[in-house]
Amino acid sequence: MDPPPRPRPHRVAVLLLLLLASSPAARAWKKDEFRNCNQTPFCKRARTRAPHSLDAPLSLDAASLAVATDGSLTASLSHPSRLRPLLLRLSALPPHALRLQIDEDYSSNTPPHRRFQVPDVLLPDVEARTLHLPQPKTSAAGVSTFALSSDVDVVVKHDPFELTVRRAGSGAPVLSFNSHGLFDFEPLQESKQEGETWEEQFRSHTDTRPRGPQSITFDVSFYGADFVYGLPEHGSTSLALRPTRGPGAEESEPYRLFNLDVFEYLHESPFGLYGSIPFMIAHGDGPSSGFFWLNAAEMQIDVLAPGWDGASSTENGRIDTLWMAEAGVVDAFFFVGSEPKDVIKQYISVTGTPSMPQQFAVAYHQCRWNYRDEEDVAGVDSGFDEHDIPYDVLWLDIEHTDGKRYFTWDHSAFPNPEVMQGKIADKGRKMVTIVDPHIKRDSSFHLHEEATAKGYYVKDATGKDFDGWCWPGASSYPDMLNPEIREWWADKFSYENYKGSTPTLYIWNDMNEPSVFNGPEVTMPRDAVHYGDVEHRELHNAYGYYFHMATADGLLKRGEGKDRPFVLSRAFFAGSQRYGAIWTGDNSADWDHLKSSIPMVLTLGLTGMTFSGADIGGFFGNPEPDLLVRWYQVGAFYPFFRGHAHHDTKRREPWLFGERRTALMREAIHMRYSLLPYYYTLFREASVTGVPVMRPLWLEFPDDKETYNNGEAFMVGPSLLAQGIYEEGQKSVSVYLPGEELWYDLRNGSPYKGGVSHKLEVSEDSIPSFQRAGAIVPRKDRFRRSSTQMVNDPYTLVIALNSSSAAEGELYVDDGKSYDYQQGAFIHRRFVFADNKLTSMNIAPKNLGNKKFSTECVIERIIILGVSSGSKKAIVEPGNHEVDIELGPISLRSGSSSVAPTVRKPNVRVVDDWTIRIA
């Protein structure tokens, strides 16, 4: 056999870079590797344009305004400085959503390429749900008005073009589009004009831009708003988006949405990270509102400080924003709601609700780059048992593969993967392996050979298979825009194709921004070409979305449609919530990254991605033991709860830091497991309504201004509030408890007044956390090895009475794994305490399906906070039998001595209707 060819010099250099890529020093944040606005021509052009500065602004042709047969409103827009007119389409979705679409009008001049409109993100029935708009009323002054609903109407000014969504009756504006005249729409061109240069240079990379500049810019204003939120993903300790331009702006760069592989990212920066969701929510004294732009090209968004336009005075309660995108079309949604939950629900109504996870996925995950071999896996697994720490999932990173060839195993380290998974599964646990999009260019690798033969790779600008570098070395990337290729990829997860996989193995998608080590900004060149002759610049932010989708579909097919997939993805886009979880990427083991994790996870929840979390302890670096403890105490509240670390870090399993700290981390994990019934119920709510599991305080207290920019405390559902500890050696913390009712300390039941801040002493054993008066929270208090082993355990109900001596809560239960719940196989109960009676009632919708679910689980304890301990008996109906009320522990945590009146062993089934009356 001939020796392998000698690598070309530039390949040798790149290989050296690749070998160094995993070095912390090599891959730490390097500002000059990534573009800023001034280095991004479309952003620089748009940012220098003054309001209403165009000589011939955008205008609407009144004669073209008409209601189409599908009920939408259409018109022609003219932009004299551009090549061809634009076509406007307005449509409505219930209850108060307006869709605005603007594209080039191709009717008179069809170019060789059309602008890309992102498919597959909106729910398939969005068009079918479109309402029939009435014929607008047009005034002599050139203003058209039509009703969006009984509460909201739309005003369209013709010349210059401006659109305003306002409250009907009062006429108060809620949102406006192009009120500052900043709209620009660069048309596709067939050839360069004289003197034009289309190519762009960044560092050593040239973007050929064969279709010329094609950016879009416009302004959107939010009225009655104190703050705006959203636009993940970026690192920040602020929940609200900070002004980026104008007097007193706290940032100098716009918020960038461009999915990138950023190692050890900055905790405080508007720079884009791994995912992009172009959705913004505004909240304040007026109605809540939201704006979503369906566009997968790079975006830059300015939040403009009052006076940004040089005006001597500013309109109170208005926030102006500037939206800039490199390519695409305008496909935007305006949402109006009486409160922020209404806005979230409307956004979810077009992009889809989060998928309902399996029960195990809501529990604790243990990960590291990398657990070395089967012996290491067995040792970690047994270590959790030996130290009485539950966990549900053990993860394997890239080193488990044969030379970074995904869907394979390194059989020298993992000779019996199915046996290994079986031993983990015997304890009710699962495993996860990593599958990234870069496919090793190796003629002996069947996946590469098949993808090459079928033409399934993304192409470079010359039409050849794109060849970039990532963990395996030379790599190519499947073109996930093509439905045929997604189907092919999904088939690779079958047991036949993924040898060594079992039904208890799930998947992790990393590096799917996509990451290309030798590419511009560590990603794919913008002039690479996808299915349908779509340039990568048009698709970039959705590549990871499609990869996530195809992987989830693969697990769905593997399970014959019966097993809910679990797929964690690093990259994401609007709609990714339908396919699984995400995490915040390569954070650092420092207090700042712990603090920034809360606004990041809250922002993800507001924009649909409720199943998210940050690496416990920080991915990069070695956390001080006290930091690691605090991170577990905060992270136990994340929707996605996983410990993870870089391979250059010291091992950090929870039992490696001394007996005291092990006990503290064990206690944090135990707390999460005891609250799994509550979390699972919240995930059910999210899967139906889109309301996130982990929430900003203002989502539950929308009228309380003290909550509007609180990014340190957070709600878990409607009933629990927690405040992290984010400083080393912190002795006290100020905690604001909103509302007029009491809050009860989760640890000891102590009551605290609502509507004020409390300065609390900090203890090492937990972070401040509280249950809201008026709430009932279900728990399971028997500690097991995994959540699977808790299935038949009894429940505890914790009732926190409000000033009316009342409380309520919910419990949702299904089989924790299948889709039978979609045919009615679940239990959904509401618990109501009033007039000294606790009542359980069924709230599951009828006629959902013919499948049933039942359980013999009972209520073992009912803890009542906020009541005197005078009563000694309770009467259970039906049956009219007495049970004892006695003082019992509020928490089963180690060393807890706090007690409260407790109904002991009423033993009523959660599936039944019943009443328990305090005698």
Curated annotation (Swiss-Prot):
Keyword Phosphoprotein assigned: no
Pathway linked to the protein: Glycan metabolism; N-glycan metabolism
Molecular function, one GO term: alpha-glucosidase activity
Localization annotation: Endoplasmic reticulum
InterPro entries associated with the record: Gal_mutarotase_sf_dom, Glyco_hydro_31_AS, Glyco_hydro_31_C, Glyco_hydro_31_N_dom, Glyco_hydro_31_TIM, Glyco_hydro_b, Glycoside_hydrolase_SF
Entry EC number(s): 3.2.1.207
GO biological process: defense response; N-glycan processing; polysaccharide catabolic process
Signal peptide (from-to): 1-28
Any one annotated GO CC term: endoplasmic reticulum
Glycosylation sites recorded in the entry for this protein: 802
Keyword Oxidoreductase: no
Origin superkingdom: Eukaryota
Active site residues of this protein: 510, 513, 586
Record field: catalytic activity: N(4)-(alpha-D-Glc-(1->3)-alpha-D-Man-(1->2)-alpha-D-Man-(1->2)-alpha-D-Man-(1->3)-[alpha-D-Man-(1->2)-alpha-D-Man-(1->3)-[alpha-D-Man-(1->2)-alpha-D-Man-(1->6)]-alpha-D-Man-(1->6)]-beta-D-Man-(1->4)-beta-D-GlcNAc-(1->4)-beta-D-GlcNAc)-L-asparaginyl-[protein] + H2O = N(4)-(alpha-D-Man-(1->2)-alpha-D-Man-(1->2)-alpha-D-Man-(1->3)-[alpha-D-Man-(1->2)-alpha-D-Man-(1->3)-[alpha-D-Man-(1->2)-alpha-D-Man-(1->6)]-alpha-D-Man-(1->6)]-beta-D-Man-(1->4)-beta-D-GlcNAc-(1->4)-beta-D-GlcNAc)-L-asparaginyl-[protein] (N-glucan mannose isomer 9A1,2,3B1,2,3) + beta-D-glucose; N(4)-(alpha-D-Glc-(1->3)-alpha-D-Glc-(1->3)-alpha-D-Man-(1->2)-alpha-D-Man-(1->2)-alpha-D-Man-(1->3)-[alpha-D-Man-(1->2)-alpha-D-Man-(1->3)-[alpha-D-Man-(1->2)-alpha-D-Man-(1->6)]-alpha-D-Man-(1->6)]-beta-D-Man-(1->4)-beta-D-GlcNAc-(1->4)-beta-D-GlcNAc)-L-asparaginyl-[protein] + H2O = N(4)-(alpha-D-Glc-(1->3)-alpha-D-Man-(1->2)-alpha-D-Man-(1->2)-alpha-D-Man-(1->3)-[alpha-D-Man-(1->2)-alpha-D-Man-(1->3)-[alpha-D-Man-(1->2)-alpha-D-Man-(1->6)]-alpha-D-Man-(1->6)]-beta-D-Man-(1->4)-beta-D-GlcNAc-(1->4)-beta-D-GlcNAc)-L-asparaginyl-[protein] + beta-D-glucose
Family according to the record: Belongs to the glycosyl hydrolase 31 family.
Database matches in PANTHER family: ALPHA-GLUCOSIDASE, BCDNA.GH04962
Name of this chain's protein: Probable glucan 1,3-alpha-glucosidase
Species name: Oryza sativa subsp. japonica
Lineage of the organism: Eukaryota, Viridiplantae, Streptophyta, Embryophyta, Tracheophyta
